[in-house]
């Protein structure tokens, strides 16, 4: 990351994995009640922010099918500007690396990186807790990225408690299909009554064993998504001969954990021609964590 008085460049918006994802019921507001553990990755989009003196908020990068006003980075900047009353503006550029509709939290992470970066660039000095509350308006996963640590999450994903996770390398494979989260949540076949657990349950069973992630929990969305999207089912079957694997979020990405980078790279080398995969490592802390107190 490169910082000047008027810009912040090369700001990583890290991807996330859901190490498990249980749907435990419905909340009074109609949203689904979830339990999950979020794992940060050292892989993601890269954002660049340049202060504007005219107060305008602009996006200097074209993204297919995402108009600027709908972009979560622009929405985050406008939300922060409105919340604080600052007269500052910003131009945002995005090097998009994460696939959309993949369950990796790309848009949500971009939004959180925007809030953290502008808290610094605009010299707002808002506390992290205030940014987290504000970020709920942008999406259920955004508060986690503002929180900035690997976390056990409940509610819609905004109730967060830090967890210490062992270092790992991952192979993440993303089939060429976009899975709309809202549509999966609407499926009648979706499990919505998984028994709630405690963070102690997770920590007691979670390990670096060869059986992980099969050794703890599941992704309640995986069976439904694999049934609707043959591409996801195909990736899961491919992993059967490589390592235990699981879908992250509502898909479409599927991941497996490895104890070393060499093991992950060796698995990546076996990918069928035309498949998209990335070898990445775990992160303990968001790269912009220090930008909020």
Swiss-Prot record:
UniProt KW Acetylation keyword: no
Catalyzed reaction equations: 4-CDP-2-C-methyl-D-erythritol + ATP = 4-CDP-2-C-methyl-D-erythritol 2-phosphate + ADP + H(+)
Active site: 16, 141
One Pfam family linked to the record: GHMP_kinases_N
GO MF, one example: 4-(cytidine 5'-diphospho)-2-C-methyl-D-erythritol kinase activity
Keyword Disulfide bond set for record: no
Keyword set, alphabetical order: ATP-binding, Isoprene biosynthesis, Kinase, Nucleotide-binding, Transferase
Family, per entry: Belongs to the GHMP kinase family. IspE subfamily.
Protein name as catalogued: 4-diphosphocytidyl-2-C-methyl-D-erythritol kinase
Function of the molecule: Catalyzes the phosphorylation of the position 2 hydroxy group of 4-diphosphocytidyl-2C-methyl-D-erythritol.
EC number: 2.7.1.148
Binding-site residues for ATP, renumbered to this chain: 99-109
One GO BP annotation of this record: terpenoid biosynthetic process
Biological or metabolic pathway of the protein: Isoprenoid biosynthesis; isopentenyl diphosphate biosynthesis via DXP pathway; isopentenyl diphosphate from 1-deoxy-D-xylulose 5-phosphate: step 3/6
Lineage, broadest ranks: Bacteria, Pseudomonadati, Pseudomonadota, Betaproteobacteria, Burkholderiales
């Amino acid at each position: 990351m490169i910082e000047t008085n008027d810009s912040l460049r090369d700001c990583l918006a890290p991807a996330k994995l859901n190490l498990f994802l249980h749907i435990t019921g419905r909340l009074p507001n109609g949203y689904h009640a979830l339990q999950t553990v979020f794992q940060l990755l050292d892989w993601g989009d890269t954002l660049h922010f340049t202060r504007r003196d005219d107060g305008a908020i602009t996006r200097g990068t074209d993204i297919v099918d995402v108009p600027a006003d709908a972009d979560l980075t622009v929405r985050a900047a406008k939300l922060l500007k409105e919340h604080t009353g600052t007269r500052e503006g910003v131009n945002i550029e995005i090097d998009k690396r994460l696939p959309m509709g993949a369950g990796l939290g790309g848009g949500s992470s971009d939004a959180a990186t925007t809030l953290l970066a502008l808290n610094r660039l605009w010299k707002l000095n808002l506390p992290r807790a205030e940014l987290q509350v504000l970020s709920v308006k942008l999406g259920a996963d955004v508060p986690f990225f503002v929180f900035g640590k690997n976390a056990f999450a409940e509610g819609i994903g905004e109730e967060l408690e830090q967890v210490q996770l062992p270092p790992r390398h991952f192979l993440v494979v993303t089939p060429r299909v976009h899975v709309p989260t809202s549509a999966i949540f609407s499926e009648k076949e979706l499990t919505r009554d998984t028994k709630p657990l405690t963070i102690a349950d997770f920590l007691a069973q979670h390990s670096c064993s060869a059986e992980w992630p099969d050794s703890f929990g599941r992704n309640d969305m995986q069976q439904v998504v694999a049934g609707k999207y043959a591409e996801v089912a195909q990736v899961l079957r491919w992993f059967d001969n490589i390592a235990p694997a699981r879908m992250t979020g509502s898909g479409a990405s599927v991941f497996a954990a490895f104890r070393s980078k060499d093991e992950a790279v060796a698995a990546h080398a076996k990918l069928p021609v035309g498949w998209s995969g990335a070898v990445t490592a775990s992160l303990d802390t968001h790269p912009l964590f220090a930008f909020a107190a």
